[in-house]
Amino acid sequence: HTRLVRSRGLGDVYKRQAMDLFRAIDGIDSIRLSGTQENGWYIQEAKDAMESGKMIYAGKYNAPDYELILDEGCGLAIESTMIHHNPEVEEKLEQFGIPVMVERSSYESHPLGRTEWMKLYAVLLGKEDVAEKAFKEQTDKLDKVLTSDDKDTGKTVAFFYINSTGAVNVRKNGDYVSNMIELAGGKYVPEDTGESDNALSTMNMQMEEFYAKAKDADYIIYNSTIDGELSTIDELLAKSNLLADFKAVKDGNVWCTGKNLFQETTELGTMIEDIHTILTTDDDSLDELAYMHK
């Protein structure tokens, strides 16, 4: 029975995707050690495993509890690329005879390229058939959107959050989130945010510049994963009253992501489906989808 350690940086939700990939193939039981504390998980199965003691906290990715890791007989450490900032941790684990695998799913620009990483973990656990089935569910959802009559809506979508200094954090063009919007039949704005160079797929811009480039967006999807979910337009406007002039705000086309958006890599087909529904629905009463709410 392989004991796996996942050392993950606490502050970085983007790097917790491996846990969701293990969840999708019913493999969370094979993870004994976590680099994220219980309150850092939105994935229920991970929370439950930590609560019951099946999974235990083994220190942050850059300061793991080596003694605990050795005592637990860990057979493989799965790290995010954050480990490259602390090569001494990787060296030490390998000195102790623990192989280290660096998880690079976050470098995939096609959303389902990220989801497909579940097949790799399935090979480790002998669950290839489970992974094939779960992956096909997501590709089927994407195919359905891509072959629908309204696959190209021409609607523009801004996806952003406002940080504590009042700057607007947007995705770069070619990043997997802007690609999800394009695959869903939308057009991501602002258009000229530069290509994602993988190392950093987001950038900050001043509100005035964002206003000039995105105020006519047909839809706003507010990224709530960093500073918590919004439930009203007033909460959005409290972040910047300039948003009141945005077309999407005036038209009532403002949606907000759920907090678990970036921890759930295995459902990116469902997320694309959600965005497509937002762009094509005529149902004004629709205000709740799998990963978004109005």
Which role does the model predict for each range below?
Residues G11, R16, D20-R23, V130-A184:
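Basic- and aromatic-lined ligand-binding clefts that recognize polyanionic substrates
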Residues Q17-L124, E208-D227:
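Acidic/His-rich segments in extracytoplasmic proteins that coordinate ligands and/or metal ions
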Residues E108-G126, V130-E137, Y219-K294:
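Structured C-terminal subdomain patch of bacterial secreted/periplasmic proteins
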Residues D140, K144, Y176, N204-E209, ...:
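Alpha-helical scaffolding within the catalytic cores
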Residues V177-L200, I221-S224:
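His/Asp/Glu-enriched short active-site or ligand-binding loop at hydrolase and phosphoryl-transfer sites
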